[in-house]
Amino acid sequence: MLTRSQMVLLCLGLFLALALCGAWQAFAWGRTQLDTGALVCADTLRLHIRAESDSIASQSAKLHVRDAVLAYLDTACPAQSKPEAIAWAAQHLFELQLTARHALAQLNIRTPVRVQLVNMYFATRRYGSGTLPAGRYDALRIDLGAGKGRNWWCVLYPGLCRSC
C-alpha cells in the first residue's frame, strides 16, 4: 500500500505527464495549422480589385469591373495549376486592363486602371464555409484610379470564384 506522500507524488507525476502530453499535442496542432496555412498561401492565386474611393459611385464601378473581369476569365482562362494561372495572367495583363477600362467606359468613367501580379499580405478571411489564413499571397490586382477605396477579392486559383 502507498503512503500518503507517495500517493501525492504519484498523482502529481500523472498530472504533469498529462499536462506535457496536452502541451505537446497543442504544439503539434499549431504547427500543423501553420504548415497548412503556408500550403494554402503557396497554392492560391487571388483576384483583388481596389476601388478608386469609398464613394457609392466608385464602389458600384468596382463591382461592374468585377463582373466584366470574371466573365472574361470564365471564357479565357484555361489554367489547371497555380503556375499556369500566373503565367496566363502575366500574358493577359493588357487584355484584363482593357476589360476593366471597357467596363468603366460603359459607366462613362474615365480613370486609370492598373493591372499587375503582386505578392501581398492578406488578413485572415472567411470564404464560404472555409477560412483563408493570414499570410502573403500571389494576387492579380486591379487598381481603379488611386485604388484607395474598399476592395473586393476572391480566390482565382483554385477556382473558387471562377474557372481560372
Please state what every model-predicted region is.
Residues 1-5:
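Short, Lys/Arg-rich N-terminal segment immediately upstream of the first membrane anchor
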Residues 8-25:
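Hydrophobic membrane-insertion alpha-helices, especially the h-region
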Residues 25-38:
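Aromatic-capped interface at the extracytoplasmic side
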Residues 48, 52, 68-79, 95, ...:
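Structured segments of extracytoplasmic/periplasmic soluble domains
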